[in-house]
Amino acid sequence: VYKRQELDFLFLCSPSNPAGQAVEKEFLIKIAEKCEKERVRLVLDECFVQFLTSGEEASMQLETGRFRYLFVLQAFTKIYAVPGIRLGYGISSDKALLERMETVRQPWSVSTPAQAAGLSALKEDHREEQTRQLVKSERERMEKELENLRIEYIPSEANFLLFNSEINWFEELKKRGILIRDCANYRGLGNGWYRMAVRLPEENDRLLECMKQVLNERS
């Protein structure tokens, strides 16, 4: 951000994936101010922002009006649990940029089922808060269970947890019918890092029970 000639775009993800940690809004505003000054396009991925305790208040989408170089990405698929429809959107106040994007947009970029699902989701205001509270409660419970199992993890604010272990959890859980994300191919992580989703209580119970079984077999 400090040397304009070396940077055209800055991509940030908040909350991040796969760690699930968010950048404080005050700091994001400072970054946006610096990018505006240096004429660097700031692309902010907020696909998991609805899972934060503060919800939409943590979002930078309303700041796009004051920062022309800010482009915010959001999605319906995470908080509303409809990944199959692949529905998301971008927000920017840069009309020239939006016009250029329109010239290369695919003719059928959003399917009819995705449009219908998105419109239906917008009517479910109460469900977003219910989901946020459920995920928060289950995530905190799972973090405590990982501590009890002496498994290192990264505190998260999203609907998943990143943890580290010498055990090949991807293969061990796959044998038991559970799939988690092997994060070995993430830059900066490597072997031994895994991401597991925070799901419904009964599903989380099954995952944790399987992890206990694996550890007991190895003790």
Which positions does each model-derived feature cover?
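PLP-dependent aminotransferase class I/II
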Residues: 69-154
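Active-site pre-lysine segment of PLP-dependent enzymes
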Residues: 3-6, 18-42, 46-79
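Conserved PLP-binding catalytic core of the aspartate aminotransferase-like
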Residues: 140, 145-177
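Short beta-strand-to-loop capping motifs
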Residues: 92, 163-165, 198-200
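PLP-dependent enzyme catalytic core of the Aspartate aminotransferase-like
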Residues: 26, 175-176, 185-219
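Structural motif
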Residues: 9-13, 43, 89-91
